[in-house]
């Protein structure tokens, strides 16, 4: 974790060409950056073998056994 000492108004420089113009006053504090960078590390990218693979699909069809048996018995047509 980093620590940054706050700047006072006397250490802040003026911006712009007009030195008598309105003052730009702001403060910048660095907070805990570990939580900022750790957010994406919780989810790891997939391994090379997992890319493009579908999850398991459950087919709920009463006719699936008949269809699969019928495909094996029929010769290919059009040859």
Swiss-Prot record:
Enumerate the Gene Ontology biological process terms.
Answer: regulation of synaptic plasticity
- Report the superkingdom from the record: Eukaryota
Region annotated Inhibitory domain sits at 43-69
A molecular-function term among this protein's GO annotations = protein kinase binding
Keyword annotations from UniProtKB, A to Z: Cytoplasm, Nucleus, Protein kinase inhibitor, Synapse
Q: Name one Pfam family in it.
A: CaM-KIIN
Q: Where in the cell is the protein located?
A: Nucleus; Cytoplasm, Cytosol; Synapse
Name the InterPro entries on file: Camk2n (IPR026779)
Gene Ontology CC entries for this record: cytosol; nucleus; synapse
The residues forming a coiled coil are none
Record-annotated disulphide pairs:
none
Tissues in which the UniProt entry reports expression: Expressed in forebrain, hippocampus, midbrain, cerebellum, and testis. Expressed in forebrain, hippocampus, midbrain, and cerebellum (at protein level). In the cortex expressed more in laminae II and III than in laminae IV-VI. Expressed within the pyramidal layer of the hippocampus and granular layer of the dentate gyrus as well as in the olfactory bulb. Diffusely expressed within the caudate-putamen and globus pallidus. Diffusely expressed throughout regions of the midbrain. In cerebellum, expressed within the Purkinje and granular layer. Stronger expressed in the cerebellum.
Region labeled Disordered — which residues? 1-21
Please describe what this protein does: Potent and specific cellular inhibitor of CaM-kinase II (CAMK2). Traps Ca(2+)/calmodulin on CAMK2.
Similarity remark:
Belongs to the CAMK2N family.
Q: What is this protein called?
A: Calcium/calmodulin-dependent protein kinase II inhibitor 2
Q: Give the originating organism.
A: Rattus norvegicus (Rat)
Which gene name belongs to this protein? Answer: Camk2n2
């Amino acid at each position: 974790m980093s620590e940054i000492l706050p700047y006072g108004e006397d250490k802040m420089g003026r911006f712009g060409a007009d030195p008598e113009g309105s003052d730009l006053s702001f403060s910048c504090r660095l907070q805990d950056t570990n939580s900022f960078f750790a957010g994406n590390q919780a989810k790891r990218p997939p391994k090379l073998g997992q890319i493009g693979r579908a999850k398991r699909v459950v087919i709920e069809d009463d006719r699936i056994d008949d269809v699969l048996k019928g495909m094996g018995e029929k010769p290919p047509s059009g040859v």
